[in-house]
Amino acid sequence: HGNFDQAQTGVKKMFNDTALEAELDVAGYQFSSANSINIGRLIPQVAYYVYAYAKLYKNGAIAKDEKINVVVPTGNFGNILAAFYAKNMGLPIAKLICASNENKVLYDFFSTGTYDRNRDFILTSSPSMDILISSNLERLIYRIAGNDAEKNTKMMEELSTDGKYAITDEMRAQLADFYG
């Protein structure tokens, strides 16, 4: 038995194993993933938010350029990251609200600026949210770190070795529209 975090960690290790990648390449294969660790799944989700906004406007539910709030139940941070990308592309979004369950690692991160997976893992009735390592948050961290790959890698290494990392006040200020 295992949980989502354990499975995803194993998958990521396989994806990052250059020797295994070379073996597969020789055989004419490569790894792919259909879950949200694949950016190819996230990018089309941006269109969901544009479409939903257009429908709200067309149906008279909102005025032109009126800001909306987006609430997403999230564990792996993929869908709400797509909303963040839509907002950055100009979609009028006010708040990005991460709905959490008892594991609430994202709620705590947005409240404190420290991502800490060192806690009890709680099995709930929402297993897709039973996650302590929200892998898509890495993409947001990269963005708010000024697209600094070294800084991003350092924080992800801290998460791997220490189970936590903290963002700077400057980075945290860029997350003012996120609520946990």
What is the predicted role of each segment?
Residues 1-180:
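PLP-dependent amino-acid enzyme catalytic core
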